[in-house]
């Protein structure tokens, strides 16, 4: 056979893209093999596919999928999302290693589209990486915005808005004849409370724009983006394609909020100018935006508070305060409706503290022990975030005998930690507030700030939620008002109440909670 004929007999050459893909897969597989054979021992986990890693094993709801994988591979689970090494922690004992022993190493956040495109290139607190900006913003939050004194100064706001909610529920139910949307009543009241704290006034959905989408829609849109595993965040060369449309959605959502926030800031600046010329300006109770604008003007902290920072922090405080508290309240009400004996016990204890004719005050809450137990049990079963916002390792470290590479994304499965039977017993998935009665003497630190990592509804360590005290106060006060004023029932057997979760970052109910109120007190609410 001649050389020319031999060449003709060969198969046609592969196109260049196919060669490049095959080459990438080969080298990626070799790299994965090298990683698995290195001296440092990575945590156990399923083998990743080339390019996509373990994306093919992701199912919704993600916190349940990760719990199932942890049951197979262990409480420190290693995955790879695209090119990003990822560790999932599903036990309180292991969480302590990451969030206390090695807290500083895991104090950062991985870069995400949400922080870049919605929060003005990481000008917020929750999504910003560990560094000078985060430290200064965190300090402002803890020492200026969310102090005990500041929270106390808005006591009248919470009282007024919750009283308005009670009246609204009674009117909407037509004196108990019609089921009311408890979920909507709670979220509306919380939104009003938060806007009055943040900006001294309530806003309607029309204030956000004329497209029919309101603040609740905006919060849901951003929350969906937070909970989505955006392919571009994990496979960088696909980021420009925006395959899931997440970047477009975030930019659009940011534009809507930005126009509203700019107007709100300008109104505050104008109002401040007018107040400065008035004799009684000192009587004015500053809202959060007032405080931030004052810091931007005086710059005594060296934090250099810009308009973008004010907008990012304002939205973050609003969305975190509204969505997380609303979810906890609707799950608490759902569980109490399913367990009438627990509802009755809580109502009796509230009545024993404030009296049948009395009105619940925030100062009464400390004496209502069973209320604390109900809220803690709800947070254990339904943490405000089932999966905590991911951490990122600033350097390589060995944790629990496993090697954790630098820039590893670390996810705390708070939902799994709160339901760990080795900590909470065989009935870990059941709603039993009484389990906390035995712990009340010594207390249980919900923030994980000391040594208690049995449940971490607000995270732990440097990245713990700075607004947890205000959130717990608001949840307890709202729940006490709802139960002291009304008896509640649902259609049909309460034990059969639909308890399905929506597949979202903050795990709300899949369907709104509908219930019938009946006035308990011999007077109109």
Swiss-Prot record:
It is a single-pass membrane protein. Disulfide bonds: none annotated. Pfam families: p450 (PF00067). Keywords: Heme, Iron, Membrane, Metal-binding, Monooxygenase, Oxidoreductase, Transmembrane, Transmembrane helix. GO terms for cellular component: membrane. Its EC number is 1.14.-.-. Its cofactor is heme. PANTHER family: CYTOCHROME P450 98A9, CYTOCHROME P450 FAMILY 1 SUBFAMILY A POLYPEPTIDE 1. This is Cytochrome P450 750A1. The gene is CYP750A1.
């Amino acid at each position: 056979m001649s050389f020319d004929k031999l060449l003709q007999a060969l198969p046609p050459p592969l196109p260049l893209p196919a060669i490049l893909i095959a080459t990438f897969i080969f080298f990626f597989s070799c790299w994965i093999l090298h990683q698995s054979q290195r001296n440092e021992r990575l945590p156990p986990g399923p083998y990743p596919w080339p390019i996509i890693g373990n994306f093919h094993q992701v199912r919704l709801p993600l916190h349940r999928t990760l719990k199932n994988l942890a049951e197979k591979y262990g409480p420190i689970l290693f995955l790879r999302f695209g090119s990003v090494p990822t560790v999932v922690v599903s036990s309180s004992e292991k969480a302590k290693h990451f969030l206390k022993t090695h807290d500083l190493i895991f104090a950062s956040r991985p870069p995400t589209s949400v922080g870049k495109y919605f929060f003005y290139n990481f000008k917020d607190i929750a999504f910003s990486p560990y560094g000078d900006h985060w430290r200064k913003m965190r300090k402002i939050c803890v020492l200026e915005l969310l102090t005990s004194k500041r929270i106390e100064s808005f006591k009248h706001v919470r009282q007024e808005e919750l009283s308005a909610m009670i009246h609204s529920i009674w009117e909407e139910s037509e004196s108990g004849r019609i089921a009311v949307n408890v979920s909507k009543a709670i979220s509306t009241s919380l939104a009003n409370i938060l806007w009055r704290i943040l900006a001294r006034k309530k806003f309607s959905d029309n204030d956000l724009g004329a497209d029919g989408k309101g603040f609740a829609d905006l919060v849901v849109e951003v929350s969906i983006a937070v909970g989505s595993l955006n392919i571009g965040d994990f496979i960088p060369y696909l980021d420009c394609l925006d395959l899931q449309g997440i970047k477009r959605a975030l930019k659009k959502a940011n534009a809507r909020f930005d126009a509203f926030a700019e107007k709100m800031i300008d109104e505050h600046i104008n109002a401040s100018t007018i107040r400065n010329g008035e004799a009684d300006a000192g009587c004015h109770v500053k809202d959060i935006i007032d405080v931030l604008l004052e810091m931007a003007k005086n710059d005594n902290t060296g934090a250099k508070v810009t308009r973008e920072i004010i907008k990012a922090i304002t939205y973050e405080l609003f969305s975190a305060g509204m969505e997380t508290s609303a979810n906890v309240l609707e799950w608490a009400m759902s569980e109490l409706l399913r367990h009438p004996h627990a509802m009755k016990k809580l109502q009796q204890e509230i009545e024993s503290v404030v009296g049948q004719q009395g009105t619940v005050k925030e100062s009464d809450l400390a004496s209502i022990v069973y209320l604390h137990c109900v809220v803690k049990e709800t947070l254990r079963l339904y943490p405000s975030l089932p999966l905590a916002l991911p951490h990122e390792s600033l350097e390589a470290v060995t944790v629990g005998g496993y090697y954790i590479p630098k820039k590893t994304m670390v996810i705390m499965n708070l939902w799994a930690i709160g339901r760990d039977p080795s900590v909470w017993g065989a009935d870990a998935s059941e709603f039993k507030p009484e389990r906390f009665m035995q712990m009340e003497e010594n207390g249980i630190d919900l923030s994980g700030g000391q040594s208690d990592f049995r449940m971490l509804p607000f995270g732990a360590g440097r990245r713990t939620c700075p607004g947890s005290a205000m959130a717990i106060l608001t949840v307890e006060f709202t729940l006490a008002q709802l139960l002291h004023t009304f008896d509640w029932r649902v259609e049909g057997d309460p034990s059969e109440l639909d308890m399905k979760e929506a597949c979202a970052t903050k795990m709300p109910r899949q369907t709104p909670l509908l219930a019938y109120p009946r006035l308990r007190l011999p007077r109109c609410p």
